[in-house]
Amino acid sequence: MDKLDMLFKKQYDLQVQGMHYDFANMTTEQRAAYVKEYTMHCEHEMHEALQEIPFFKPWKRYDKDAVSEKNQVMWAMARKEFVDALHFFLCVAIGLGFTPDELYAMYCDKNAVNYDRQKDQATYKPSADET
């Protein structure tokens, strides 16, 4: 079992055993509500991660020396919040019905498209199925 499989399994087990979700018997409406709820949680945690990053707020005056002294702590806090978001991201992936292999395959396909886009940005025009 690879690490992505393990992450999915751990999160699935938490959702089923700890949170008592029954994915096999969810109605379409329940599944949609689940995905919506966990997407919002993921967005919230990502916003918290952003707030920990030095110089996040463009309108705020930062003391560069103070930021430098707290730099490692700030990045560590951002990483912690990112891991919180990852839990919710995995919940969304599970709610959407992804398996680790499907997510990996779709990621690789999209990554190839993104590389193609970068090769010639000036002339690239996405097809309808690439968006």
Report residues per predicted region:
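Flexible "arm" and connector segments at domain edges
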Residues: 1-131
